[in-house]
Amino acid sequence: YQIALSKSYGCDCILIIIAALNGAQADEIYSEALKHNLSVIVEVHDQKEAEMALKFDQALIGINNRNLKTLEVSLNNTISIFEVIKTHKGPIISESGIKTANDAKYIYEKTGIKNFLIGESLLKSNNPNELMKKLIQITQ
């Protein structure tokens, strides 16, 4: 019901957090989203979740660098999880903990990932435009 309602309000993408659902729930939500012509981001936090996410072949996969239990952030989480999902045909996103262009460059050089979810760093930046320019340049 929520997926259909979201679509009716103009939603074009949903987020499935693997850690918050069991396998059957994730499957059902994914199928329902595709029926409503919605894009799906499947978020993973560890290698086990990444293995589960591979079956969602039309999804974007987001690798969250924040440990949900400790709230610690490690960019190396993207590096290690990427090894599990590097065969995924869709886009892969590195999420959380990217504070500088050098952080993004580190991930890009290790994995080739050039999609990043960056929020806090942009909000706290004295010059978000300059930060965005630097981030965009790393993949060009």
Q: Locations of the language-model features?
A:
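Active-site glycine- and acidic-residue-rich loops that bind
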Residues: 35-46
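Glycine-rich phosphate-binding active-site loops on the catalytic face of alpha/beta enzymes
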Residues: 3-25, 62-71, 111-132
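Short, surface-exposed connector motifs at secondary-structure boundaries
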Residues: 10-14, 32-37, 85-90, 111-114
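Catalytic cores of alpha/beta
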Residues: 1-9, 46-57, 89, 94, ...
